C-alpha cells in the first residue's frame, strides 16, 4: 500500500497530465481550498463520475438503509443515544446524497452531513433548504457540520455524535480519493457505533492512473486539482478491515461493485464520459 498522491505518481508539478486533454494549465491546491472554490460550480460543471455515482446510489442506498434498519431493530438494551437512528453523510459536499438520505430514511432518523469544506457546506445548506429538508419545524432532522478527516477534532462534531452517541450507519461517496486509507477508515470508525454500517463509493484506481478530480476555475482558466490518491480496491478492503470493518455483500453476493464505462453509459452520463470508454472508473462497497 502507498500514500503516494496521483500528482506524485504522474511525476509532474503544475503541468499537464494524461487525463487533461482540454489544454488548461493545472494548479494543485490543498483539498479544502480546492473544494471551497469548486463549491460554486460543483453541481453544474457536468462531472460524469458524480452522475454515475448518483445513478448507482439509487440502488445502493436502499440496500444500505435496509441493512442499517435491520441491525438497529434487532438490537436490545439500547442506550438513549442509540435509540435515535443517526445516519452520517461523511464528506457530504453540496448535499447530493444527504438529500437522498433525508428522503429515503425513516422520518424519525437524524441525518448528519459532515464535510471539511465550509464552502461546500454553505451550498449544501442552501440546497437542502430549497428542497424543504432543512429549516423546517424539526430543525434537528438534518444538521450539517465541519469535520476534517485529516485533522479530526471531536469537539467540531454535532453534539448528537459526540461521546458514545455514535451513528448507526454512514455513507461516504467520492471522498476516499482525497484521504490516506488508514486515516479515512479510522475517522469513519469514530463516527459509527459497533455493528453499524459504512457504505463507500470512490473513483477506481484504473481511472486514477490516468487522471483525478478537478475543475476549471472560470476566473483564472486553470484546472484546479486537490490532493488525490489512486486507491486500489484490495488496499481499500485491507484498510477497512484493519479499522475493524467487515465487507458485507451488497446484494447477497457482490462484495465490490465496479463500473467500466461503455457506450450505453455515455448516453446516460453525457459526452464527457466518452473519453473513459473501456476504463473502470468507479467502485462501491459496504
From Swiss-Prot:
Stretches that traverse the bilayer: none
SUPFAM superfamilies: S-adenosyl-L-methionine-dependent methyltransferases
GO MF, any single term: S-adenosylmethionine-dependent methyltransferase activity
CDD domains with a match to the protein in the record: AdoMet_MTases
Record bears the keyword Transferase: yes
Induction: Down-regulated when grown with elevated levels of potassium chloride.
Gene Ontology biological-process entries: cellular response to osmotic stress; methylation
EC numbers on record: 2.1.1.-
Keyword Cytoplasm: no
Role according to the record: Involved in osmoadaptation.
Similarity comment text for this entry: Belongs to the methyltransferase superfamily.
Name of the protein in its database record: Uncharacterized methyltransferase AN0656
Amino acid at each position: 500500500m502507498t500514500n503516494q498522491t496521483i500528482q506524485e505518481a504522474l511525476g509532474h508539478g503544475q503541468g499537464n497530465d494524461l487525463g487533461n486533454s482540454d489544454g488548461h494549465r493545472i494548479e494543485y491546491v490543498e483539498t479544502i481550498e480546492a473544494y471551497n472554490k469548486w463549491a460554486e460550480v460543483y453541481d453544474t460543471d457536468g462531472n460524469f463520475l458524480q452522475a454515475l455515482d448518483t445513478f448507482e446510489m439509487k440502488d445502493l442506498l436502499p440496500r444500505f438503509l435496509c441493512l442499517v434498519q435491520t441491525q438497529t431493530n434487532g438490537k436490545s438494551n439500547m442506550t438513549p443515544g442509540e435509540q435515535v437512528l443517526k445516519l452520517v453523510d461523511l464528506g457530504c459536499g453540496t448535499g447530493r446524497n444527504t438529500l437522498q438520505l433525508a428522503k429515503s430514511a425513516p422520518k424519525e432518523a437524524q441525518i448528519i452531513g459532515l464535510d471539511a469544506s465550509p464552502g461546500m457546506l454553505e451550498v449544501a445548506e442552501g440546497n437542502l433548504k430549497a428542497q424543504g429538508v432543512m429549516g423546517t419545524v424539526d430543525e434537528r432532522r438534518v444538521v450539517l457540520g465541519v469535520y476534517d478527516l485529516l485533522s479530526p477534532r471531536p469537539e467540531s462534531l454535532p453534539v448528537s455524535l459526540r461521546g458514545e452517541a455514535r451513528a448507526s450507519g454512514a455513507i461516504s461517496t467520492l471522498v476516499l480519493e482525497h484521504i490516506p486509507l488508514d486515516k479515512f477508515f479510522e475517522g469513519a470508525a469514530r463516527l459509527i457505533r459497533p455493528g453499524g454500517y459504512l457504505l463507500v463509493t470512490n473513483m477506481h484506481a484504473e481511472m486514477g492512473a490516468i487522471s483525478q478530480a478537478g475543475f476549471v476555475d472560470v476566473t483564472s482558466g486553470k484546472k484546479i486539482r486537490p490532493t488525490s490518491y489512486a486507491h486500489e480496491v484490495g488496499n481499500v478492503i485491507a484498510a477497512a478491515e484493519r479499522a475493524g470493518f467487515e465487507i458485507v455483500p451488497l446484494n447477497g453476493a457482490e462484495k465490490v461493485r465496479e463500473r467500466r464505462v461503455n457506450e450505453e453509459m455515455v448516453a446516460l452520463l453525457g459526452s464527457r464520459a466518452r473519453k473513459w470508454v473501456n476504463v473502470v472508473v468507479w467502485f462501491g462497497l459496504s
